Amino acid sequence: MGKVYDWFEERLEIQAIADDITSKYVPPHVNIFYCLGGITLTCFLVQVATGFAMTFYYRPTVTEAFASVQYIMTEVNFGWLIRSVHRWSASMMVLMMILHVFRVYLTGGFKKPRELTWVTGVILAVLTVSFGVTGYSSPWDQIGYWAVKIVTGVPEAIPVVGSPLVELSRGSVSVGQSTLTRFYSLHTFVSPLLTAVFMLMHFLMIRKQGISGPL
């Protein structure tokens, strides 16, 4: 094992990377509330893992979506647990995100030179909410259907561009298969990818600038 480690160490300088990570200065005022962002990240990773597991059985069609969710809950080994953890971690992620935003705002973590960190955080907050909106439609039950109909109908109040926006979000004039396909794509691919990118930017900036000092 020593020779294998030395081979990687010679090429990647693993020890230097480890020393940089473990020796980062942590201000003495930091408390448990500064962990809220990390907890949000943990919830996101749980979401990715459980969501990926359910994609093996879920069918994003208006005729099979509800039945496939029922199949996951009743027939798949530990399917009920996987879906329940997915739902619980989704609620926890939203809660932790809100608390994290309040903590950063109240402690002045958005001030110079951390404005861009705050901007990426706000974008991540919007993406977090988008997970809830797009994922709510997945079972395609009565609640999911009418929630999608209401949400996609909101832009109709906007003059001139309202109706085109509604049709764009629904994929047609009315809510149907195109709507479910769009929401499923956003929920399982677009939103997770954007979230991963902005999280990486967010953490790199925190790593570079460090934790903000006390007020």
Swiss-Prot record:
The record, for InterPro entries, names: Cyt_b/b6_N, Cyt_B6_PetB, Cytb/b6-like_sf, Cytochrome_b_N_euk/bac, Di-haem_cyt_TM
Subunit structure comment from the entry: The 4 large subunits of the cytochrome b6-f complex are cytochrome b6, subunit IV (17 kDa polypeptide, PetD), cytochrome f and the Rieske protein, while the 4 small subunits are PetG, PetL, PetM and PetN. The complex functions as a dimer.
Q: Which cofactor(s) are needed, names only?
A: heme b; heme c
Q: Which residues bind heme c?
A: C35
Name the keywords, alphabetized: Chloroplast, Electron transport, Heme, Iron, Membrane, Metal-binding, Photosynthesis, Plastid, Thylakoid, Transmembrane, Transmembrane helix, Transport
Q: Name one GO biological process term.
A: photosynthesis
Q: What is this protein called?
A: Cytochrome b6
Asked if Repeat is a keyword of the record, the answer is no
Q: How does it sit in the membrane?
A: Multi-pass membrane protein
Family indicated by similarity: Belongs to the cytochrome b family. PetB subfamily.
Molecular function per GO: electron transporter, transferring electrons within cytochrome b6/f complex of photosystem II activity; metal ion binding; oxidoreductase activity
Question: Which parts of the chain span the membrane according to its record?
Answer: 32-52, 90-110, 116-136, 186-206
Q: One GO cellular component from the entry?
A: chloroplast thylakoid membrane
Where would you find this protein in the cell?
Answer: Plastid, Chloroplast thylakoid membrane
The record's CDD domains line, in alphabetical order, gives:
Cytochrome_b_N
Another remark in the UniProt entry says: Heme 1 (or BH or b566) is high-potential and absorbs at about 566 nm, and heme 2 (or BL or b562) is low-potential and absorbs at about 562 nm.
> What does the record note about the cofactor?
Binds 2 heme b groups non-covalently with two histidine residues as axial ligands.
Organism, per UniProt?
A: Huperzia lucidula
